[in-house]
């Protein structure tokens, strides 16, 4: 998992590739995105603004997509680990691009203005004590060059 301390830092790196630039463009328009609706730019990128106040019991992992979480308001703890260090609880489902795992990972706290990038070789779970607002972008992994 990579944590970027500001939207500006993300945008500085994003110009290197079209899909990362698309993510940066979404950051610029995040306040205009209606929460609770998932938008799509083909199969390569989908996004939504969500309010989150739940704590995940299990780790979630993806294979086809890299997830980018842009924190617009509030703070949230994230526990993450390499999938190889976790135990699979529910098998991977192609139709949802999700697999569920359990175990222990490292915990970090992120806040408004920070961005996390969850690679598809990792799994994560969110620990929430208060409402957060974030832009969540899923970018197809096979077409990406690592951002930072």
Model-derived features: positions:
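A short hydrophobic beta-strand segment most commonly corresponding to one strand
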Residues: 68, 130-148
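A short, N-terminal "cap"/entry segment at the start of jelly-roll beta-barrel domains
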Residues: 1-49, 56-61
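Short glycine/proline-enriched turns and hinge-like loops at secondary-structure junctions
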Residues: 61-62, 128-131
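Glycine- and acidic-residue-biased ligand/ion/polar-headgroup-sensing regions
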Residues: 64-66, 70-99
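A generic structural signal for short beta-strands and their flanking turns/coil linkers
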Residues: 41-45, 64-66, 76, 133
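Short acidic (Asp/Glu) patches
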Residues: 48-62, 93-104, 119-122
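Conserved metal-binding segment of the jelly-roll/cupin
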Residues: 108-128, 139
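Short, surface-exposed secondary-structure edge patches
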Residues: 68, 106-109
């Amino acid at each position: 998992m990579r944590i970027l301390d500001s939207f500006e830092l993300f945008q500085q790196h994003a110009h290197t590739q079209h899909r990362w630039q698309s993510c940066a463009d979404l950051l610029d328009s995040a306040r205009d995105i209606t929460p609770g609706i998932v938008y799509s730019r083909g199969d390569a990128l989908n996004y939504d603004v969500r309010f989150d106040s739940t704590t995940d019991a299990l780790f979630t992992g993806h294979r086809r997509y890299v997830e980018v979480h842009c924190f617009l308001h509030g703070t949230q703890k994230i526990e993450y680990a390499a999938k190889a260090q976790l135990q699979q609880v529910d098998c991977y489902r192609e139709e949802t691009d999700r697999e569920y795992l359990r175990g222990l990972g490292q915990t970090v706290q992120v806040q408004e203005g920070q961005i996390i990038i969850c690679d598809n070789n990792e799994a994560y779970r969110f620990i929430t004590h208060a409402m957060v607002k974030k832009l969540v972008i899923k970018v197809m992994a096979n077409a990406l060059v690592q951002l930072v």
